[in-house]
A protein has these predicted regions:
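Membrane-anchoring hydrophobic helices of lipid-metabolizing enzymes
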Residues: 1-92, 97, 125-129, 136
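Soluble catalytic domains of membrane acyltransferases
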Residues: 60-197
Length: 197
């Protein structure tokens, strides 16, 4: 549709123009692969990122069959079975459309409890939360340097829920250092710590 075409064209222009975010993307891609990324890969990565935002804008209208047809979720039965005895914690990276996958999980009878970074402006964060809650997810907001671990533990303890958490970047300041690509990186420890509770 029109939104997706506009996102595709706009992302291509943004990637070629550059800027701070694109420079960070290039540096991150180089860290993961050990070499400078080809221009086509940078453009494809920016298009993928912008496509996720465009899809998010359209999520409210994609329920039922259109949503079900847009997702392939291998192993969902095992995930549901595991969540019967308590929360299932998923450590995810910054890739793909988490909200679309979360909406699909909620539409298929499971509750999602997750953490979302408090982005600026506040009104944008509130819109993201409202969208996710409207799709059936429970959202706990967290800002830089904040810890919501005890709140998360209390919210999920003893419940049959799925807890997807982005783990490839730490904003709390209390993450753990790991090898990621060609360098060391500070990642969130919450997923592993929550799984042990």
């Amino acid at each position: 549709g029109l939104v997706m075409r506009a996102a595709h064209v706009g992302a291509g222009i943004a990637a070629r123009r550059g800027g701070v975010s694109i420079a960070r993307l290039r540096a991150n891609m180089a860290r993961l692969t050990g070499s400078e990324p080809a221009e086509e890969l940078v453009v494809a990565a920016v298009r993928s990122h912008i496509r996720n935002y465009a899809e998010e804008l359209m999520l409210g209208s994609r329920r039922g069959a259109p949503l079900a047809e847009s997702i392939t979720f291998e192993g969902f039965g095992e995930l549901v079975a595991a969540s019967v005895d308590g929360p299932v914690v998923l450590a995810l990276g910054h890739s793909g459309s988490w909200d679309r996958a979360g909406a699909w999980v909620c539409a298929n009878g499971r509750t999602i409890v997750t953490v979302a970074e408090k982005v600026e402006p506040r009104s944008l964060f509130q819109r993201f939360v409202a969208l996710r809650e409207g799709l059936g997810m429970e959202v706990i907001g967290v800002g830089k340097g904040e810890s919501v671990f005890s709140t998360l533990v209390e919210r999920v303890r003893g419940r049959s829920v799925i807890v997807p958490l982005l783990a490839d970047r730490d904003i709390s300041g209390s993450g753990i250092e790991v090898d990621l690509g060609t360098r060391r990186a500070l990642v969130a420890a919450g997923s592993a710590a929550l799984a042990l509770k």
